[in-house]
Structures are given as structure tokens and as C-alpha cells.
Amino acid sequence: MGDKDMPTAGMPSLLQSSSESPQSCPEGEDSQSPLQIPQSSPESDDTLYPLQSPQSRSEGEDSSDPLQRPPEGKDSQSPLQIPQSSPEGDDTQSPLQNSQSSPEGKDSLSPLEISQSPPEGEDVQSPLQNPASSFFSSALLSIFQSSPESTQSPFEGFPQSVLQIPVSAASSSTLVSIFQSSPESTQSPFEGFPQSPLQIPVSRSFSSTLLSIFQSSPERTQSTFEGFAQSPLQIPVSPSSSSTLLSLFQSFSERTQSTFEGFAQSSLQIPVSPSFSSTLVSLFQSSPERTQSTFEGFPQSPLQIPVSSSSSSTLLSLFQSSPERTHSTFEGFPQSLLQIPMTSSFSSTLLSIFQSSPESAQSTFEGFPQSPLQIPGSPSFSSTLLSLFQSSPERTHSTFEGFPQSPLQIPMTSSFSSTLLSILQSSPESAQSAFEGFPQSPLQIPVSSSFSYTLLSLFQSSPERTHSTFEGFPQSPLQIPVSSSSSSSTLLSLFQSSPECTQSTFEGFPQSPLQIPQSPPEGENTHSPLQIVPSLPEWEDSLSPHYFPQSPPQGEDSLSPHYFPQSPPQGEDSLSPHYFPQSPQGEDSLSPHYFPQSPPQGEDSMSPLYFPQSPLQGEEFQSSLQSPVSICSSSTPSSLPQSFPESSQSPPEGPVQSPLHSPQSPPEGMHSQSPLQSPESAPEGEDSLSPLQIPQSPLEGEDSLSSLHFPQSPPEWEDSLSPLHFPQFPPQGEDFQSSLQSPVSICSSSTSLSLPQSFPESPQSPPEGPAQSPLQRPVSSFFSYTLASLLQSSHESPQSPPEGPAQSPLQSPVSSFPSSTSSSLSQSSPVSSFPSSTSSSLSKSSPESPLQSPVISFSSSTSLSPFSEESSSPVDEYTSSSDTLLESDSLTDSESLIESEPLFTYTLDEKVDELARFLLLKYQVKQPITKAEMLTNVISRYTGYFPVIFRKAREFIEILFGISLREVDPDDSYVFVNTLDLTSEGCLSDEQGMSQNRLLILILSIIFIKGTYASEEVIWDVLSGIGVRAGREHFAFGEPRELLTKVWVQEHYLEYREVPNSSPPRYEFLWGPRAHSEVIKRKVVEFLAMLKNTVPITFPSSYKDALKDVEERAQAIIDTTDDSTATESASSSVMSPSFSSE
């Protein structure tokens, strides 16, 4: 073999068992590497890179890195680096080197060396040097194969054993099968290959190339792969390649026990350049049948596959695991990145990455910390499928564990057609699939304008009849900003969970972000794993695994294997594996992928997905989904985190720090831990924990606990704990505890917006507590619903109402102004549709708590139903399109304005309800309240309406609970005081007794409104509106059933009797003898008068007129001199056609 080029159609078989072919060593070469093919000699390069293929001459090289083109002054431990210019002072220990010039002064222990020209001053320990030059045709490179039959061939202790096979241009039908192991009935353990890289640069004009690398396809074999520390694989494929198959690190064994362990810092780099057709990149696949395959210990094993423009029908199937009847364990892949940048004009591209589709197998994926996948895809894609991190096993026990800091970045630019982004999917059938321990595993997919038929299916999990547990996804964001117009038929299906007959456990995904900013951030200090700067970075300290600068960075200390900066970020400290900022300055980001369009300033972001279009100012988000969606597209379905399990056994646990936050504008001075942020305008100083936020106008001082928030203007200084928050106009200082509060304004035709749905059947544990209420729809649920129940005729069989103000399941105003718009919000099984082609389906709670909010329609007719068992989910349909007040910055206290704007008034009623809840919480903990707290936590932007909101809220809690607020000092500090005192009538005088007296007045008022009696069902239905439920202790009233049926009956305030001829027995309440006293009647009248003043303006005038009529009748009774006569006349004359008794 000598110094000549490899012959055409040659097959070098390297390092096979029972055969050795040592060559004469060159002079001065000290090599321990089995294969070295340098193309040129780098000079004085001091690196630890495993793969090195310099194109220029280097001197004095001491290399342990097989592939390296280092910049000047760079100290890197990255396994893969390909500089464009010749480095100087290269000192490498790379086992594989391919130089075209003769090395001088080489001390070599390599048994085989084939170099074209001697490099000078190179100190190499590579045992094998084999340059394969251009014009290969039908070449088979079968390297490190082990195919014995009935043999025990142990491969052990190959430290620094590199393989470098540069394949140049004009190669046709080339098969590169590397590190394969296909023995039959064999026990072949592969152990101890530290720093064993594989470098296969493949240049232009390839046709039907198969790159099958690190495959393991034994049959009936026990094959153990262990200890491949720093074993990178680099396969740069240049333009005009057709029908290329890159099948890397595959494992296709049948009836085999194959164990892959200890691949520390084993990177795989496959840059694929433009004009590809029908390319298949199948990386790190594991598809054994009836096999026990264990993949363990691949720390810092990156895979980089940059694919450039004009590729057609490309399949990137990466890190797949599709065994059948197999026990496949993937463990310990820290910092194992996969980078696949793809440029413009792709057609029919399939990116199937990190898939796991075994059948009847036990597949365990564990320990992949810092294993990023980067696939930047540029414009003019057609029919692209990005299927990433999928797990679709059938009848399989698949466990995914320990993938900290494993980002996936797929930036895709404009003019996409028929693109499918199916990412992090898990759709196993009859499988036990456990996803655990993916901290800081980001996925970044920036998708820009002019999309057509794009499917973004991200982090889906769709099991049926499954035990699906979603645990521990703190800061696991997905940010997919979809930019300006001409998007057609876009589906955003995020965080879905729909497996069939599967036990799927998702655990421990802390800080797993997906960030796709579209503009450059300024002053950003980022730990984001993927960032692309367009120019030279200066003094960057990067731990990110992929770093490919176009020009040599100066004074750079890089631990990341791949780094491609385009512009110099200044003062950047990056721990993220992929870092491609356009021009961020001083960014400190923990999100793995960051693609900002405009510079956020002073941003400290831990959110994985970040798509700001303009800066957010002073916002602190803890809500899981905050995104005002303004999509100007046609036929766009948007499906947000759905959960469709049937017979699911366990619900999601804990209020995780919200998954989706998508601001469309860059934030300034933002400290963000939220995964998705895409505001259109700039919130300043935002501290966000919320995963999805797409505000359109700024919110100021909002504190939101609601789960869905889509404001149209950017929120400012917002503190949100809610997962979804979609207000139409900016609230100020809001404190949302409702899980879904979202006015959705969609300006599109035929748009479907599906927001977090939950269709479980037979759930075992319903949501509990105030913070776990899935949907809170503030239709002034305290007093509005109470009043509606008071003013309606009694119902026959209402369900037991929901409990507590904080557990009201629906609080979400939805305002949709498109034609043919479907808004499906947190639905259970029933789905209701409504006229005007607008469907707003809002969730029902548990069977005991079907509904807690009245339904209001601002059309011609108003329906307030008692919500019996047959009643559907509450629907709020708005036909008014006057939402300018919602975005107005100049809010004034105008009652006439409130009267004329029902939608705006509805929002003020929400504020009244929220403030009342906030005051009750303060009352329970016995703390005073200040005006500043109310403005900051609830009122937010509505400071001009604070007097109206505060007056109604304090009147409401005084009416229903007998609790008033008194100002105690000039700084607007208030304390709570009980106001009801019936001691003269023999009532209790202690604090609880006073509150119970107020409840008694309420019940007597209900009976009075109904006539002479009220059924037990009506009483409990009204009380449920204020959180008082039978059999459950209340903070102010105690146990209410005992009060109503025993205590007050014994004290003769109430009469409790059975309805005659009722089967099953039904009961009703009447006034007792002591209730007819002067004091009690006067209290009832005062209560009704105060209740009339707190009636929401949105209620029709007929209800206010009815309440006024009741008040006048009661006042007439009080004014009558003869008390007994007045009582008799009241019982006979208070009846009206609209309020007939049962």
C-alpha cells in the first residue's frame, strides 16, 4: 500500500481479528493510532481533538485528536472541529491523520502508514495512516469489522485508536461500513476504545452513497461495546450528492445481547452540503430483534450533520432505537450532541432524530446529559419531516432517562412547504415507556415566514389506555415562533400525550428548553446550547459541544465540540452545546438554542425556547403558557398542549414552571426561565418562569396564576404562575389563580385553536385545591353566579356544585373575531360547537364540581342556566368586536364607558372577582392588606379603575361573609373587621358565629326570593357559587350541612321539612319562627339592597328589575306596623310569574 492513492473499488480491511498488516514506520514518528491519513501537516496545534483532517501543512504537531482545524490560540476539548484555514502550532495526538505532504521528524509506532507527503515536525502516535484520495468508484471501506462464526473475539484496550478515511469527490456507489460487528453465534466484547475517532470527509458529486458507521448487527451474539471515550465520527459530505445514506452508529442485532458502554466524548460530525437528493442520514440507530442491547456511557458524544441547500428527499434518522422484543438500554450519554444544519431549497426532507420504536422490547434510554441535536434548516423547504426524539415502541418497556442538557436545534427559514416537525414524540402502543431525567434538553426550531402546510408536532405523547405520568418538567419549554404572513395550514401540536395501552412516564426534564429567537440579542450572557453568531467571537468561554467559527477566534477557551459563530459575541459565557447567535452581546442564557432577531439587552434566560420579536420589559413570568396569538394566516390549526389519555391512572403533578412562552419580540433586561417567549413588543426587565408567552402589548405589574395568557400587548413586570394566560387587553397587577384565562383574538379565516385539552376517562384523582383548578372563568363567579342562582327559579336536580372560589373550574373570557374559528379550551370528553362558526368549549371539572361560572352572551338573547347534570360546558360567546379599550393605555374611571362596553365591563368584573378572592386569602391568614399590594398583585394596568373595583370587592365580601375593610393609617393599609352582630337576637357573638350569621342571612334571602320556601338543591346550588359545599369544612362558616339541617333548625331560624309525595325523598327550607323578627327582616332587606348594588353591569336589566322588585316588597313588609300581618302578606304577595315556587 505505500504512499500511493487507494485503488478504485478497493476494500481495505483494517484491524480485523487474527490479521495484522504493519508497515514500515516513517522517520521520527511516534504513533499509537491504528489509522492515520493526514492530508496536510498542521503546525504546532495543541489540541485533544480525536479527529483531525487539516488541509494545510502543520509543523511540530502532537495530536491526540483525529479531526481538527483549530483556530489560533484556542484551547478546546471538543471532539470534533473542522477549521477552514490552516492552524499553526498544532500539537495533536490524533490517531488518524491524512496529510498530502511528507511529515518530517516523525516518531511512529504505527504498523500501517500511507501518507502522500511527510509532515514536518509532527509527533504522532497513530499506528495506521491511510489516505484515500479522490475518484473512488464502488469502494467498500469495511473497517474494524468482526464477523467470525462460533468465535470468541475480544477487542480490548485500543486507546487512541483512530480511523480516518477521507473520501474525495466523484465517488459513485460508495459503501463506508465502519466499526461494524456482525458475528453469528459469537461472544465478541468491544472494550476500551478511548479517543477512537472516525473521520470520513466525503466530497462532491456522490451518487447512491451508503455511510454505515458503527453498526452492530450480530445474530445470536453477545456483543459488548464498552469504553469508547472521545471516539468521534466525522463525515463531511459536500454538495451535489444524490441518494446518500448516512447510517451511523446503528445496532441491528437479532436475538443478541449487545451492550454499548462507555463512549465518552464520542462525537459524530457529518456536514452535508447543498444539492442533495434522497439523502438518508440514520444516526445512532438501534434496531435489534429479540436482543438485549445496552447503550451506556456516551459522555460528550456529539453528532454534527450540517446539510446545506438544495437537498431533496432527505431523511435524517438520528439516534433511533427500534428493536423488536429487545431489552435495549441507552445510558450515560452526557454531552452527546447531534448537529445537522440544513440550508435552503430542501424538498421532502425527513429528520427523524432520537427515535425509539421497538416492538415487544424493553428499551431503556438513560444518562444522556448535554446531548444536543442541532439541525438548522434554511429557506425553501418542501415536504420536510422533522421527527425528533420520537419514541414509538409497541408492547415495549422503553425508559428514557438522564438526558441533561440535550438540546435539539432545527432553525428553518422561510418558504417552507408541507413541513412536518414531529419532535420529542412518544406514541408507543402497549408499552411501558418512561422518559426520565432530561434536564436542559432543548429543542430549537425557528420557523420563519411564508410557511405552507407546516406541522409542528412537538413533545407529543399520545397514549390510549395508558398510565401516563408527566413529572418534573421544570423549565421544559418549547418555543416555536411562527413569523409573519403567508402561513397556510399550520398545525402547532405541542406537548401532546396520546399513547395507546401504554405506561408512559415522563420524569425529570428540568431546564429542557426549546428556544428559537429570530433576532440578535444584545448584552446577553447565555448558557444556551445552540447559538450561531455571524462573526468572530472574542474571548468566549464556551462549554457548548459544537463550535465552528468561520474565522479564528482569539483567546478562546472552548470545551464545546462544535461552534459556528458568525459574529463576535463579547463577554459571552456559554455552557450550551450549540451556540449560533447572530450578534448577541453579554448574553447569559441557560437555554440550549437561541436565535433572536433583535437584541435583548441584559437578558438572563433559563428558558429553552425564546422567540422574541421585540424587547419585553420588566416582566416576570411563571405562567406555563402566556401567548397572545395573533396569526394572520389561512387554514391554520393550532393545537396546544393536549392530553388525550383514556383510563389514565395519574394526572400531571404539581404546577410545573410553565411549558410554553413565545414572545414575538426580543426582551430587554429579561431574566427568563420560561421555555417559550414570543412577544411582539418589548417587555422590559422580565423575569419569566412561564413556558409560552405571546403577548401583543405590554402588561404592567401583572401577577398571574392563570394557566393560559395571550395578551395582545406586551406585559410589563408580570409575575405569572399560570400555565395558560390569554388576556386580550393588558391587566395591571393581576393575580391569576385560574388555570385558563384567555381571550383569544385570532385574525384568520378557518383557524382552529385548540388549547390545553384533557380528555381522560375514569381519572383516578381529580384536581384539588385552589392552585390546581384547571379552568377559572371569572364571570364574577362569586356574586354573579350567586345572584344568577338567587334570581332564577329553583331547579329539580342540580349536581353538587363546585367547591370554593379558588376551585372554580372555568374562568376564561374568550373573544374570537375570525370567521370559522374553533377555540377548544381544556375540554373533557364533550365538545360543544356554537353558531357563527365559532366553537369555544371550556372544560368541565370533576363530577362533583361541574360548573362554577354563569354563561353570559352579549348577543340579543341571554341564557343563564342552572347547570344541571345534563348541562354542557359553559360557553362564553362574544359578538362585540370593540376591543380597543382592552389595549388602551389611557384608562379612566367612567361608569358610562363601562355601561357602553360589555366586554370591557366583563374584564372589570373579573378584576372584582380576583380582588375578592385575594382579600379572602389575606383574611384567612390574618394579615392586613395595603393598596400597593392590591395594585401590584391584582389591579395591574387598571389603576384608573381601582376605586370601582375595590368598592365592589369589599362590598361583596361584606355581603356574603360579613367581613369589612377599615383603613387604619394614611398609607392605605386596611384591616378586616366583622360587621354582622345579631347578639340581641340570641345569635353567636364570636368570630365564627358572626360569619355564620351572614350565611344565615344569605339563606333566608334565598328563601325570601323564592317565595315561602326553597328546595335543598337550590340552596346548595347557590352556596356552591361562593365555595360553600355540603360535607366540606369552610374557612369562615365551618361545616355548612350541620348548620343548615341541625343547628339553625334547633335554634328555630330555619325549618327543614320533607317535600310531600316525593320519591326519592326531597327536602326544602322555610323561615323559622325566630326569622320573622324585625331585626332579621331588616338584615335581609339590607342584604338584598347591597346585593343589588353589586350586580354586574353585564347582567340584563330584567334581573336587576326583578331584584329591585323583591327589595321593594321586603321594604313594604318592614314598614308595615303589624309584624304578623306583614309576614302573612309577604308570604302571599311576594310570588311573581318569573319566580314561581316549586
From Swiss-Prot:
Q: Name one GO cellular component term.
A: nucleus
Where in the cell? Answer: Cytoplasm
Q: Which UniProt keywords apply?
A: Cytoplasm, Phosphoprotein, Repeat, Tumor antigen
Q: Which GO terms describe its biological process?
A: negative regulation of transcription by RNA polymerase II
Ranges for region Disordered: 1-132, 502-778, 791-893, 1118-1142
* Residues annotated as domain MAGE: 908-1106
Q: Where is the composition biased (Polar residues)?
A: 92-103, 614-626, 671-680
Instruction: Name the tissues where it is expressed.
Output: Expressed in testis and in tumors of a wide variety of histologic types.
Q: Name one Pfam family in it.
A: MAGE
| Record protein name field | Melanoma-associated antigen C1
Q: Which organism is it from?
A: Homo sapiens (Human)
